Amino acid sequence: MVFKVSTVSTSPIDGQKPGTSGLRKKVKVFKQPNYLENFVQATFNALTAEKVKGATLVVSGDGRYYSKDAVQIIIKMAAANGVRRVWVGKNTLLSTPAVSAVIRERSGADGSKATGAFILTASHNPGGPTEDFGIKYNMENGGPAPESITDKIYENTKTIKEYPIAQDLPNVDISAVGVTSFEGPEGKFDVEVFDPADDYVKLMKSIFDFEAIRKLLSSPKFTFCYDALHGVAGAYAHRIFVEELGAQESALLNCTPKEDFGGGHPDPNLTYAKELVARMGLGKSDTGGEPPEFGAAADGDADRNMILGKRFFVTPSDSVAIIAANAIGAIPYFSSGLKGVARSMPTSAALDVVAKSLNLKFFEVPTGWKFFGNLMDAGMCSVCGEESFGTGSDHIREKDGIWAVLAWMSILAHKNKGNIDGNAKLVSVEDIVRQHWATYGRHYYTRYDYENVDAGKAKELMEHLVKLQSSIPEVNKIVKGIRSDVASVASADEFEYKDPVDGSISKHQGIRYLFEDGSRLVFRLSGTGSEGATIRLYIEQYEKDASKTGRESQEALSPLVDLALKLSKMEEFTGRSAPTVIT
């Protein structure tokens, strides 16, 4: 059949400004007439013609509720805009890191390469009819659209008058692998449904020594548990951990992708990954039995990770520092060295200490993976990470949850080369972390999240903190009045970043109070929630003395926490006596 293209009249819809990772709203908002269509067309209009006409696009996501409807709408709009091919992961499933890998690595049967992707995800936000949906666009390098593009998309949403769509194009069966071909006014249009794991698994096997990891997993001394929280990581977990690496099926937890993530919150932290946390011996009550040696979890779209040892939590800030410190010896991909390392500004300075010690280039960037992407494209950065459970490398242009798990497995395999056979005790996750602290010092670190705060009140709190910064002597008077047992503030500012690659400047990236002993308080408003504002407070204290690195984090940070809450007048502005989540 030859499909026809019709033009639908529309008008701008307020609030379609993409955040750090696309547009996220409640499903009911996306289901409003023209809501999704306006945003998709605004994106097409923001791209240059060669990225649309005759191009190959990837459309997939984490499988959350409304994805199946959204994919069909985007296919019809892509056809109408002159796109030549759309690649879809079977059942709309492709993890965010796998989308990046597909853009960068995959070639079609005719040699075609993808120029970009619509990723349907709200990441770690809940899914279901009353929960969140999201969409973001990734570029031909496999990374999220830069601000120059997202700003253009937003401007386009404010002026849009119409969009083309191939309404008579039948829905494509996305449950079966294969190619469906159509004829349109501009010639052929193909939709190819493919296995979501193939390209990604191939890439992982080129990075890590699967044989070494397989050997570790085959040891009766090594036990392992992976929790996909019913997100898209489940589409990869069986293939990688069971089929390729020989783990037991019983090692996989919640690995069936579900539209509503099984009613849970697909955010891999100590609050939401309750089942894994209990199994690893970190729950409030003892589950009985010996916990596994190693545990890990993913979020909805599998770009985030949480790393756990037996009764031991690894902070994301420590995780990226430990991966960087061990990458050259443990991971074949890095055997010839690291080009540089980078972290987001709120992430602890543990990575800075490793970079200094190993004489590596180091970068501190705003929150948002696109900033790392620029450094990687310029060959300046190999390993990077964020405190928000995101870790990755230059193999793709997104953070990558399964990559981080394989990196940790590689480090464990490397450290236990001589211990796998025989009676020798395995070097544990906790051993590796404590040894790291003994070598580099420890950054005590915690994050307080205040979710769904009244946006006006959140803004007032931030303005109060900026105003305080105008006089450091005055700030120190207030600080000493609150707590005499903390160091003095050395400097305070609003973080601003000048990209060393393209010279672009990002302002208002978080409020910082930097103390004379290396401690930090950071306050940020987050752009990833779908309702209200989220205030994130980051508290960090550096301890170089190896004999003092074994304290409980909350105990060590207690004076700084007290100071942060009183200095910011948190309860006064928000009405909250406690945070929603403590990490």
Swiss-Prot record:
Subcellular location per the Swiss-Prot or TrEMBL entry: Cytoplasm
Listed cofactors: Mg(2+)
Cited InterPro entries: A-D-PHexomutase_a/b/a-I, A-D-PHexomutase_a/b/a-I/II/III, A-D-PHexomutase_a/b/a-II, A-D-PHexomutase_a/b/a-III, A-D-PHexomutase_C_sf, A-D-PHexomutase_CS, Alpha-D-phosphohexomutase_SF, PGM
GO MF entries: magnesium ion binding; phosphoglucomutase activity
Residues annotated as binding Mg(2+): 123, 299, 301, 303
Residues the record lists as binding alpha-D-glucose 1,6-bisphosphate: 24, 123, 303-304, 367, 386, 388, 399
Cofactor stoichiometry and binding remark: Binds 1 Mg(2+) ion per subunit.
Predominant location: cytoplasm
Keywords: Carbohydrate metabolism, Cytoplasm, Glucose metabolism, Isomerase, Magnesium, Metal-binding, Phosphoprotein
Catalysed reactions, as listed in the record: alpha-D-glucose 1-phosphate = alpha-D-glucose 6-phosphate; O-phospho-L-seryl-[protein] + alpha-D-glucose 1-phosphate = alpha-D-glucose 1,6-bisphosphate + L-seryl-[protein]; alpha-D-glucose 1,6-bisphosphate + L-seryl-[protein] = O-phospho-L-seryl-[protein] + alpha-D-glucose 6-phosphate
Residues bearing PTM Phosphoserine: 123
Function: Catalyzes the reversible isomerization of alpha-D-glucose 1-phosphate to alpha-D-glucose 6-phosphate. The mechanism proceeds via the intermediate compound alpha-D-glucose 1,6-bisphosphate. This enzyme participates in both the breakdown and synthesis of glucose.
Record's subunit section: Monomer.
NCBIfam families registered for this protein in UniProt: PRK07564.1-1
Family under the similarity heading: Belongs to the phosphohexose mutase family.
Name used for this protein in its record: Probable phosphoglucomutase, cytoplasmic 1
Organism (species): Arabidopsis thaliana
